[in-house]
Amino acid sequence: HITYPTYEKNFSPSNFVVAAFFREPHKHIESHLNWVRHLMEPKKHDFLIEHPAVVQTIAQKLSLLDFASSKTWQQFVKQLKPVQFGLFDNLQVRYLSDAKPAERVNETHLQQALARLKKIQLVGIAEHFDESMSLIHQAMGFDMPVEKNVRSNVNSFSYGADFSNLDNQQAIGPLVKFDQVLYQQALLQFEQQRVKFSKD
């Protein structure tokens, strides 16, 4: 992932068409928690020790939790330390804003992210991956149609967390509340792209 501040610092906007994908926030945090937890599997040991100490510590903590319990996530949110905010707190807003790693995402960061979202020329939605790729493909003027797109970074493992469950959604709410607003705006831009390219 490349954050928007990193993009602005290192790339000339005039030389690039910017595309970004967004994911339903509950699905995103569920996947991310599973990914970090998976680092504690014995076969992942070498990969785990390549990560910073903060990631290793939280992976170990997650390995001891009951992912299926809403009480787990209530406590997880309450006990999250500033050094861990950058791993789990409203990550999609975080990617588009200037939020510091040890800083909670707030309303100012959300407004900054929404403003930057408007500068992104092509918005993809993970839940509509193939259609998103087709729209991006069409917008870029490529000759050949997109026949098959492969998502190579999809988790195939689960430890029992289900954030389609309302109790779990409420428990994890503080970690996705700003992302939910951003995601709704991303969906709107995606729908606008649908309309635009259906006319072209």
Outline where the language-model segments fall.
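A residue-level signal for conserved active-site and pocket-lining positions in enzyme catalytic cores
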Residues: 24, 136, 179, 183
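PAPS-dependent sulfotransferase catalytic domain
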Residues: 1-21, 27-148
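PAPS-dependent sulfotransferase catalytic core
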Residues: 2-6, 98-99, 111, 145-200
